[in-house]
Amino acid sequence: MEALYPKLISADLIVLSSPVYWFTLSAQAKLFIDRWYALESPQDSALRGKDFALVLAYGDTDPYTSGGINAIHTFQDMCRYLRGNIVGIVYGSASNLGDVQKQPELMERAYELGKKAGAAVP
């Protein structure tokens, strides 16, 4: 993480991506976020006010029964705590290679998030 902290601090936009495992973000994604604690002080956070985006994939067809909505709420709570700006969230059902490409509406949402992300970066 020592190599990543300066990159996180200098980033204009932080995009998190995770599969949904056991009804929330993957353990690896959550561990990555948990380690941001090292960037906190009693007065402030080095990530306060950053722009964030989230991309999720889950196996079920429903964001509620898959736990995708739990992952989204975790992300929203994190951004609220950091006083961050949510640039966008893209989520959808995808279990196998190529599943996303078969969903034009999901591809369009991902494309639009990319445009928003590009606009958020000075």
Question: What is the role of each PLM region?
Answer:
Residues 1-80:
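Helix-loop-strand module that forms the ligand-binding subsite of alpha/beta enzymes
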Residues 75-122:
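Glycine-rich phosphate/pyrophosphate-binding loop and the adjoining helix
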